């Protein structure tokens, strides 16, 4: 029985470490990516997985070591995994409708710094021209709204 407890504790610890590592990858993606759409992808996909792994690890730890099953942890798992992607989808949709900067591969420098802002990679005229094109596209498609 003691060996089983140790194995489950090890599984819980590995899940916590994996969740922390994936959260670190998510943070790097948020800093590295150039526009709101890529950043929202990094924030949603990997942080949802990191929270999932972390909470499952905590749930296993509590069940094995204290014999306590937390319904709150289970509800947190369900709530976060349902609301995080939906919330980020709404943020990305609002950004798209408001004409947010959209990264294009040809605009970026090949060896840009990790902290280089997306606006520093493009000229003001190019950004204004793209914003004007997006506005014309929006007027064409959403004139009934």
From Swiss-Prot:
Give one Pfam hit by family name: PhaG_MnhG_YufB
Q: Which InterPro entries match?
A: PhaG_MnhG_YufB
Name the domain of life: Bacteria
GO cellular component terms listed in the entry, alphabetical order: plasma membrane
Q: Which coarse location class applies to the principal site listed for this UniProt protein? A: membrane
One Gene Ontology MF term:
sodium:proton antiporter activity
- How does this protein lie in the membrane? Multi-pass membrane protein
Q: For this UniProt entry, which segments traverse the membrane?
A: 11-31, 51-71, 72-92
Location(s), subcellular: Cell membrane
Going by the UniProt record, its keywords in alphabetical order are: Antiport, Cell membrane, Ion transport, Membrane, Transmembrane, Transmembrane helix, Transport
Membership in a protein family: Belongs to the CPA3 antiporters (TC 2.A.63) subunit G family.
Subunit and interaction comment: May form a heterooligomeric complex that consists of seven subunits: mnhA2, mnhB2, mnhC2, mnhD2, mnhE2, mnhF2 and mnhG2.
Which protein are we looking at? Putative antiporter subunit mnhG2
What is the organism field in this record?
A: Staphylococcus aureus (strain JH9)
């Amino acid at each position: 029985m003691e060996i089983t407890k140790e194995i489950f504790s090890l599984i819980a610890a590995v899940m916590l470490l994996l969740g922390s590592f994936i959260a670190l990858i998510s943070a790097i993606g948020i800093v590295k990516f150039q526009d709101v759409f890529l950043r929202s992808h990094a924030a949603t996909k990997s942080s949802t997985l990191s929270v999932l792994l972390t909470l499952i690890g905590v749930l296993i730890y509590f069940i094995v070591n204290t014999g306590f099953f937390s319904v709150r942890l289970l509800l947190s798992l369900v709530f976060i995994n349902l609301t995080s992607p939906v919330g980020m989808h709404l943020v990305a949709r609002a950004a798209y409708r408001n004409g947010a900067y959209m990264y294009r591969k040809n605009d970026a420098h090949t060896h840009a710094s990790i902290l280089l802002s997306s606006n520093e990679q493009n000229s003001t005229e190019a950004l204004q021209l793209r914003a004007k094109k997006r506005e014309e596209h929006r007027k064409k498609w959403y004139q009934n709204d």
